[in-house]
């Protein structure tokens, strides 16, 4: 993938860029693997906003992605197409299995039309192949990693992301996450070899607010520019700092949203670096 820059023909196009979509080989998805996707606009069943800054955007159809691949061990598949998916930053690959079934997977970097991929403990260590962690050598870059055996891929699924397998000890493998966190995962969990493609996604300059609206993202307004009735930081004469430590619109202190006693914390060997210091 490469980035194509627009000429500054309008203020919205000045500095804006877009993917050249050179790796895309098909413009329409496989009909049997598409499901309708109903936009909620950040509302719950009562119509109340539960997630702010969401709504609008272009209509999408959901592509059914195979995040497990454990029922196709030993069955080779040919990459029929590399396709665009509006629901994620990564590209997706349409696989045609030898038994006639078709499935989508996340397209890793280097996978192209016509390649053959496989899954199972005896699969080769090459991009696109899916194996249990116990069968992958240390130092390998992987993506689409399970947190629990058979639970489906949960980690490293976005464009350009990857996890490094540092080593294996007893029934656990040590993984270095994209955040820098080192975590232990059961060696029976499966992962796909390689890093996710479309890494240049992070370098796209969206150029104007309207392109964010096309993606279904609404404006995020700072509390200090609101009125006191709308936010604890609002009001005051002239430009103010908010007058207190940062809080949410409902008065909750900023940050510290995670459960300190989460049961899976025991699998974290080294925490990610957040750049923040919280006193408890």
From Swiss-Prot:
It comes from Mycobacterium tuberculosis (strain ATCC 25177 / H37Ra). SMART domains: Ribosomal_L2, Ribosomal_L2_C. The lineage of its organism: Bacteria, Bacillati, Actinomycetota, Actinomycetes, Mycobacteriales. One of its GO terms (molecular function) is transferase activity. One of the primary rRNA binding proteins. Required for association of the 30S and 50S subunits to form the 70S ribosome, for tRNA binding and peptide bond formation. It has been suggested to have peptidyltransferase activity; this is somewhat controversial. Makes several contacts with the 16S rRNA in the 70S ribosome. Residues 27-59, 225-280 are annotated as: Disordered. This is Large ribosomal subunit protein uL2. Transmembrane segments: none annotated. GO terms for biological process: cytoplasmic translation. Belongs to the universal ribosomal protein uL2 family. Residues 37-59, 268-280 have a biased composition (Basic residues). The gene is rplB.
